[in-house]
Amino acid sequence: MSSDSVVAGNISRADVERVVRAVLTRQLAGATTSSGSVSSAGGPPNPLVVNISARHVHLTEEHVEVLFGKGVKLEPMKWLYQDGYYAAKQTVTIFGPRRRMIPDVRVLGPCRNASQVELAFTDGISLGIDLPVRISGDHHDTVGCVLVGPAGVVELKSGVIRAMRHVHMSPADCAYYGVKNGDEMDLKIHSGPCTTTLEHVTVREDKDVKLEVHIDTDEGNAVDLSHATKVELVKPVGCGCHSK
């Protein structure tokens, strides 16, 4: 019998706990979860997690009532990785300028001060919208769309964006990587023959966040994130062309 084998009749609770701990430790060293996200541990103060941010909508309280009815509040359906944030039960239909639509787009909570629609590049093609790449909240020179809910319609004049890929970092994470809010990093995704580096990952620093990278569905598919075995954040190094 192999030294790695365990006889079922003699296994104890301690043996089970030891095996489970060993498996979890190996998985945290770089494993893909069922949700398509990837985590990588070892080194930084917090484990690095990369998640795909699918198309979604952020709404003001006023727009929630217009779309879903007076007095209606967003109802959490699934809690997200960042504490306090969730995918709501409510969804809307998005109409673009060519009267093309995308139905059942999830609303994320909690509510914001300004409504915003975040789409992938291919979503923009479907709707006939030339999506500008923006950090969340930057609606300068952005287009609008029409949101339709079960109780009403909201016409947004602006706020439809393709979210710039970014990483949420705490002050401790920033100190570890030697970066600050607004800096850019590189994300290396090891995924078999499809190992890829995504540049220009913008740092978003906040004291109350977990270390997490957000990329959109197009980017996640391009790097084959669902099969990734390891992810790394790297501070870009200049080429030295202008150094003395």
Swiss-Prot record:
Residues that coordinate or bind phosphate: R112
EC class name: transferase
How are cofactors bound according to the entry's free-text note?
There are 2 Zn(2+) ions per monomer; Zn(2+) and CoA bind inbetween the 2 domains in each monomer.
| Residues where CoA binds | I52, S53, A54, R106, N221
**InterPro entries linked to this entry:** PTAC (IPR008300)
Residues at which Zn(2+) 2 binds: H166, H168, H214
**In which residues is Zn(2+) 1 bound?**
H56, H58, E118
Functional summary from the UniProt entry: Part of a bacterial microcompartment (BMC) locus required for growth on plant and algal sugars, including L-fucose and L-rhamnose. Thought to be active on lactyl-CoA in a lactaldehyde-degradation pathway. CoA is regenerated within the BMC via this enzyme, although there must also be cofactor transport across the BMC. Directly targeted to the BMC.
Q: What is this protein called?
A: Phosphate propanoyltransferase
Source species of the chain: Planctopirus limnophila (strain ATCC 43296 / DSM 3776 / IFAM 1008 / Mu 290) (Planctomyces limnophilus)
